[in-house]
Swiss-Prot record:
Described function: Cleaves viral precursor proteins (pTP, pIIIa, pVI, pVII, pVIII, and pX) inside newly assembled particles giving rise to mature virions. Protease complexed to its cofactor slides along the viral DNA to specifically locate and cleave the viral precursors. Mature virions have a weakened organization compared to the unmature virions, thereby facilitating subsequent uncoating. Without maturation, the particle lacks infectivity and is unable to uncoat. Late in adenovirus infection, in the cytoplasm, may participate in the cytoskeleton destruction. Cleaves host cell cytoskeletal keratins K7 and K18.
Catalytic activity as recorded in UniProt: Cleaves proteins of the adenovirus and its host cell at two consensus sites: -Yaa-Xaa-Gly-Gly-|-Xaa- and -Yaa-Xaa-Gly-Xaa-|-Gly- (in which Yaa is Met, Ile or Leu, and Xaa is any amino acid)
InterPro entries, per the entry: Papain-like_cys_pep_sf, Peptidase_C5
Major enzyme class: hydrolase
Regulation: Requires DNA and protease cofactor for maximal activation. Inside nascent virions, becomes partially activated by binding to the viral DNA, allowing it to cleave the cofactor that binds to the protease and fully activates it. Actin, like the viral protease cofactor, seems to act as a cofactor in the cleavage of cytokeratin 18 and of actin itself.
Gene: L3
Protein name in the entry: Protease
Lineage: superkingdom: Viruses
Active-site residues, record numbering mapped to chain: 54, 71, 122
UniProt site (Cleavage): 51-52
Organism: Human adenovirus A serotype 12 (HAdV-12)
Subcellular location: Virion; Host nucleus
Amino acid sequence: MGSSEQELTAIVRDLGCGPYFLGTFDKRFPGFVSRDRLSCAIVNTAGRETGGVHWLAFGWNPKSHTCYLFDPFGFSDQRLKQIYQFEYESLLRRSALAATKDRCVTLEKSTQTVQGPFSAACGLFCCMFLHAFTHWPDHPMDKNPTMDLLTGVPNCMLQSPQVVGTLQRNQNELYKFLNNLSPYFRHNRERIEKATSFTKMQNGLK
């Protein structure tokens, strides 16, 4: 089943992101409400009524006027639209970010894959990214102690047998990271790992 909204919220708070975390949202995320405040959110590509499909993480750094979009699969804009019918451009337009003085916002998006194709851990990877974002907001994607635990591979190799070992190690590193920093994860580890396992989505099963 992957991760529930309540679960992700509990883990994000354990990771120290609480003061900046706006919450979990479905595809109707209204955007960032304050252009002057460091803030972040976890957003699903589908409507809440569907039960959810895929989690993404967003972060806004007012100092650099940069909006970060983290997708554990590193899909291109076109693929996000093709697979999930999800577009974030309208999200940025209706956000308070459009009210910046020069209306100039830099979008930095993850382009590499860190999650296996059959893994259901997208929400947990988003929690990990938000830890990096709130602690190193000027370079949350890489070159920080959190995200450097993961090894990205080109998105075009997502289904390649050559990278299975790398992506499996990423998920193991993710679990170790959360086990170290999140009491909620520790107390519920067996259930969470079963629900988000590396092969959870194989054969189309959730």
